[in-house]
Amino acid sequence: MVLAMESRVAPEIPGLIQPGNVTQDLKMMVCKLLNSPKPTKTFPGSQPVSFQHSDVEEKLLAHDYYVCEKTDGLRVLMFIVINPVTGEQGCFMIDRENNYYLVNGFRFPRLPQKKKEELLETLQDGTLLDGELVIQTNPMTKLQELRYLMFDCLAINGRCLTQSPTSSRLAHLGKEFFKPYFDLRAAYPNRCTTFPFKISMKHMDFSYQLVKVAKSLDKLPHLSDGLIFTPVKAPYTAGGKDSLLLKWKPEQENTVDFKLILDIPMVEDPSLPKDDRNRWYYNYDVKPVFSLYVWQGGADVNSRLKHFDQPFDRKEFEILERTYRKFAELSVSDEEWQNLKNLEQPLNGRIVECAKNQETGAWEMLRFRDDKLNGNHTSVVQKVLESINDSVSLEDLEEIVGDIKRCWDERRANMAGGSGRPLPSQSQNATLSTSKPVHSQPPSNDKEPKYVDEDDWSD
C-alpha cells in the first residue's frame, strides 16, 4: 500500500481557488457557452462508463472509436476567457468538485490569419478544454514536471462544439488552440517564461490499434491505468455519464473511492480519578479498525477532521450515516499503520482510493483522494464490482482486434460507395495522430507512440 501511495500522488492545481461570487459568475459564463438552460451544480465534463464484455459487440464492433491511454492524474477542464471589465485574459481550471482555480502566467493566442506577430496581438476568449493534469518524469533531467494533457474541446473562442463529432472537436483543438500555443512558444520563448506548466495534446489512435497503445503504457513518462475508447462521431455529453465513452482497466486497476473512518480503541487509566476527563483516552499504539463507507447520495455535511487525534464522536457518526453506510474494512498491516501515523496527517473522513486484492479479496488503499468531496456513489461501486466480476482482459481485447479492423473497413467501404475514398473521419483523425504542431501527417506506425512533444523536454 505505501509504495502504491507514493507513486500515485495526485498533482495539485497551481492556482487560487475562487470565492463563491466569482465562481458563480464563471459558472454562468460556462453555462451560456455550452447553451445550457442553467448553471450546473456538478462538474461539466463527461464521464466514461466501465468496459464490459457486451461493449465489444454493441460498441467497439458497431462504431468507429479512437483509443488512447487512460492517464492516472487529475481530471480538470480549462476555461479561458477575457474579463469584460479589465480586458485581461484569465485561465481557470475546473476540478471534479466544480471548483474554479485561477491559474496565472499563461497567454493563449488565437490562430494567426496572416503573420506570426498576431500571436502577440490576439487572445483566446471563450475556450473550454478537457484534459488531465499529470506529473511526468522528464527523460532528460529525470525531474518531475507538471503537464496538462488535452483530449477534448467543448468550445473554442465562443463557439460551442459539444454537438459536433469527436473528430471535428479534436481538429478544432489541434488547429485553433494547440497550434497557436505551440507556435507562440517556438517564436517567442521569452514571452512564455511565466507559463506554470506545459500543455500537450493526448495521442489518439484508431481502436484497432489498441494493442500497440496498451503495450506502451509502461513506457509513458507518467502513470497510466488503462485505456479510453472515444466514439469518433458522437457529440460530447457535458455534465454526465456517456454510455458510449468507455474506460478499460486491467482487473487489478479497477478501483473504488470510499470514505475512510477509523474506529480507534479507548483504554482506561485506573490511576486517575473516575471523574477525570483524561481517565479514558484513545490508544494509538493499537491498530484501529479501518472502515470503508460508501456514499448513498446527498450532501455530506461532515468535514475532514483537522486533528488526527479527534475521531468521529457519536453525533458525527449519526450525521455520517445519513449519507454513507459501511461497506467493508480496509486491510492495513502493522507496518502500514505505523507509516500512516508517521504522516502526521488527518485520516478520519478522508476519501481514499482502494483496489480489491485479486487473491485475498481484501480492499487495499492506493492513495488519498483529497480532490473529491465524496466517495463513489453506491451505484458506481456496484458498476465497478460488476466490471471486476465481468472483467475484460487485454488478451480478450487482442482477440477481437481483427474483427474491429474488419468492421472499420466495411464501414469505410460502404460510406465511400466502394470507391476506396477515405472517410472524413479518417482524414480528420490523421490530423490528430501526431503531437507535432503540423497537423497533416498520417498516424505514426512507431512501436512507441509519441504522446508529448519531444522537443518540449529540453527547454
Swiss-Prot record:
Keywords from the named record: GTP-binding, mRNA capping, mRNA processing, Nucleotide-binding, Nucleotidyltransferase, Nucleus, Transferase
CDD domains linked to this entry: Adenylation_mRNA_capping (cd07895)
InterPro entries per the UniProt record, alphabetical: mRNA_cap_enzyme_adenylation, mRNA_cap_enzyme_alpha, mRNA_cap_enzyme_C, mRNA_Capping_Enz/RNA_Phosphat, NA-bd_OB-fold
Compartments, as annotated in UniProt: Nucleus
pH-activity relationship: Optimum pH is 7.0.
Gene Ontology CC: mRNA capping enzyme complex; nucleus
GO term, biological process aspect, one: positive regulation of transcription by RNA polymerase II
GO molecular function annotation: ATP binding; GTP binding; mRNA guanylyltransferase activity
Catalysis: reaction(s): a 5'-end diphospho-ribonucleoside in mRNA + GTP + H(+) = a 5'-end (5'-triphosphoguanosine)-ribonucleoside in mRNA + diphosphate
Region annotation (Disordered) ranges: 415-459
Enzyme class, first EC level, given as a word: transferase
Annotated phenotype, changing E97A: Temperature-sensitive
Compositional bias per record (Polar residues), positions renumbered to this chain: 424-444
PANTHER family, alphabetized: MRNA-CAPPING ENZYME
Function: Second step of mRNA capping. Transfer of the GMP moiety of GTP to the 5'-diphosphate terminus of RNA via a covalent enzyme-GMP reaction intermediate.
Subunit structure: Heterodimer. The mRNA-capping enzyme is composed of two separate chains alpha and beta, respectively a mRNA guanylyltransferase and an mRNA 5'-triphosphate monophosphatase.
Miscellaneous information on this protein: Present with 279 molecules/cell in log phase SD medium.
Similarity-based family: Belongs to the eukaryotic GTase family.
UniProt-recorded name of the protein: mRNA-capping enzyme subunit alpha
Organism, scientific name: Saccharomyces cerevisiae (strain ATCC 204508 / S288c)
Lineage: Eukaryota, Fungi, Dikarya, Ascomycota, Saccharomycotina
